[in-house]
Amino acid sequence: MITSIELRNFRNLENYKVLINRPLVIIQGLNGVGKTSILESIYFAATTKSHRSSVEKDMIQYDKPYASVKLIEDSKLHEIVLTPNGKRTTINKSEVRKISDYIGQLRVVMFAPEDLMLIKGSPSERRYFLDMELMQVSKTYLRNLNSYKKILKQRNALLKKNRNLTDYTFLNILGEQLYDVGIQIFDERQKFIEALNQKFKTIQTKYKDFEVEMLYEPNVTKENFLKHLKTKQKQDIMYETTTAGIHKDDFKLLYKGLNAKDSASQGTSRLIVIELKLALLEWIKEVTKTDAILLLDDVLSELDLERQNLFMSQLSKNHQVFITTALPINGHIDFQKIVLQEGETINAK
């Protein structure tokens, strides 16, 4: 459980610290006061990434040289410092030089309004979801993904520089390396999606008439991937890129057997993604034997009162949960309320 959050120059929070004393934390305040930034800081400290922007320097407050996040979780101090030149990560004040050794020390599951792009967005956004979640629990996946990206970059560079290439020896060597790593990523993604579908079945017993399924859509089968790399060199040379592989994979979220992208309303889409995050939470617990921290940004908006109560009742008491809201939350559940105003806590009890 996180017991302390300390931020410096992070977004609009210049000098912020709050102590946490309960598993369920409600962060309340008007829009723009920094509620989402608190969740983003926790996500950043866990994954070294922002869920809001690919431009990391945006997290550094304007005209400041750095941003930092310190979290105390189960007596372990996690710290990440961001400058325009890079990141520095430490655990208990000892530097962790390899990001691969740092990721997975603290596991989180995030829901944000941007996650609706898992339904409406591009394949690259859905691949990013697969990669981020698998990286948190599997060092092997992270290592394979980094290797795949490195080999793919080499192969694409070779394709671009040699439009008249006739000797495919080196191209084929890179192709074999790409295949060997790629099929391992393929297998892990497939197992991950199968596992989430099993979790969906359990969750759906509590959500009446709400059938959700995840359908993996690999760009190419393992057999055809190898065949492509061995026989389609001319095609790849012509396009100056590797035109097939796991870097083009996708998945669909189905609602009652139909593609949610085409059949689900905005409110239903939100519930589908919420269900996905709850399934993910249970999957992480099953695989790692640890409880991930759940971060919910504006999760209750667009849900009617019945759905809100149902959702709140599904939150496991084993997981620490942070929820942001612009509206007051009432009910019998025990929670710590943090009232935020212009980047400062005016009440935390």
UniProtKB/Swiss-Prot annotation:
It is found in: Cytoplasm. Coiled coil: none annotated. Keywords: ATP-binding, Cytoplasm, DNA damage, DNA repair, DNA replication, DNA-binding, Nucleotide-binding, SOS response. GO terms for cellular component: cytoplasm. The keyword DNA repair applies. GO terms for biological process: DNA replication; DNA synthesis involved in DNA repair; double-strand break repair; SOS response. Pfam families: SMC_N (PF02463). Gene3D superfamilies: P-loop containing nucleotide triphosphate hydrolases (3.40.50.300), RecF/RecN/SMC, N-terminal domain (1.20.1050.90). GO terms for molecular function: ATP binding; single-stranded DNA binding. ATP binds at residues 29-36. Belongs to the RecF family. The RecF protein is involved in DNA metabolism; it is required for DNA replication and normal SOS inducibility. RecF binds preferentially to single-stranded, linear DNA. It also seems to bind ATP. This is DNA replication and repair protein RecF. It comes from Acholeplasma laidlawii. The lineage of its organism: Bacteria, Bacillati, Mycoplasmatota, Mollicutes, Acholeplasmatales. The gene is recF.
